[in-house]
């Protein structure tokens, strides 16, 4: 059984992320060859946070992804199902309203947020369609969703090289810098098995979102999907 074939049981995935929380941001920088910071900047530009907006940052981990929204003056709620991640985040940013929550049963009222966003976490939720509907539920009419997730490179020769990198280079790199390298083997397998850009767009539409669009980053290694709640 591969780690990605755990059927993404929440307790299994949460336990993996608990184990990597302390060095999570450093490890991401290493295995992404520094691209993770560029991707976060692209998310911040897409969210375009404004003062007094309410933003849900789902799968926020240690809330590194939340900081650009905070600096823009928005009220940001970092939410994650890994208590280990939340603990590290709270130590770093004690003023933030860290919230434990499952993406399939968000602990928020209907139509709470102006924008909802999730970066590199949608793959880890057991039922993607349920999660997209939950994000829709807690978004105000006219509000937006921004999803940053690993995807499929658009150039076939590069896709082949990228797949080799996922399965052969990430595990040893993770062993060098992570306290739980098995979590990054799971990461590689879950990326390989994840739907491509059009497939995720179709799931967004099925969940009720409108004006669905995406932009490829790093040649499609990552895709930034955007949509609006009518």
Curated annotation (Swiss-Prot):
Which Cys pairs does UniProt list as disulfide-bonded? Answer: none
The record ties this protein, via Gene3D superfamilies, to: Vaccinia Virus protein VP39
* Annotated protein name in UniProt: Demethylmenaquinone methyltransferase
**What top-level branch of life does the organism fall under?**
Bacteria
**What is the reaction catalyzed?**
a 2-demethylmenaquinol + S-adenosyl-L-methionine = a menaquinol + S-adenosyl-L-homocysteine + H(+)
**Swiss-Prot/TrEMBL keywords:** Menaquinone biosynthesis, Methyltransferase, S-adenosyl-L-methionine, Transferase
User: Where does this protein come from, organism-wise?
Assistant: Streptomyces griseus subsp. griseus (strain JCM 4626 / CBS 651.72 / NBRC 13350 / KCC S-0626 / ISP 5235)
The entry assigns this protein to a family as follows: Belongs to the class I-like SAM-binding methyltransferase superfamily. MenG/UbiE family.
Q: Name one GO biological process term.
A: menaquinone biosynthetic process
Q: Which InterPro entries match?
A: SAM-dependent_MTases_sf, UbiE/COQ5_MeTrFase, UbiE/COQ5_MeTrFase_CS
Q: What does this chain do? A: Methyltransferase required for the conversion of demethylmenaquinol (DMKH2) to menaquinol (MKH2).
């Amino acid at each position: 059984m591969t780690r990605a074939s755990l059927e993404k049981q929440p307790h299994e995935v949460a336990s993996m992320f608990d184990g990597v929380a302390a060095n999570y941001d450093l490890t991401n920088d290493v295995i992404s060859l520094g691209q993770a910071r560029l991707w976060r900047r692209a998310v911040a530009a897409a969210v375009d946070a404004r003062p007094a907006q309410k933003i849900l940052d789902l799968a926020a981990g240690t809330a590194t992804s939340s900081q650009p929204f905070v600096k823009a003056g928005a009220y940001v709620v970092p939410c994650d199902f890994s208590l280990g991640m939340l603990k590290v985040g709270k130590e770093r940013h004690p003023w933030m309203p860290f919230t434990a929550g499952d993406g399939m049963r968000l602990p928020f009222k209907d139509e709470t947020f102006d924008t909802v966003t999730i970066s590199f976490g949608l793959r880890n939720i057991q039922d993607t369609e349920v999660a997209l509907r939950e994000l829709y539920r807690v978004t105000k009419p006219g509000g937006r969703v921004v999803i940053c997730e690993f995807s499929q490179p658009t150039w076939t020769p590069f896709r082949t090289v990228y797949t080799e990198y996922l399965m052969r280079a990430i595990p040893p790199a993770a062993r060098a810098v992570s306290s739980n390298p098995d979590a990054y083997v799971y990461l590689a397998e879950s990326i390989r098995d994840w739907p491509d850009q059009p497939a995720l767009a179709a799931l967004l539409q099925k969940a009720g979102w409108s004006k669905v669009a995406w932009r490829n980053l790093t040649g499609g290694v990552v895709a930034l999907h955007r949509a609006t709640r009518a």
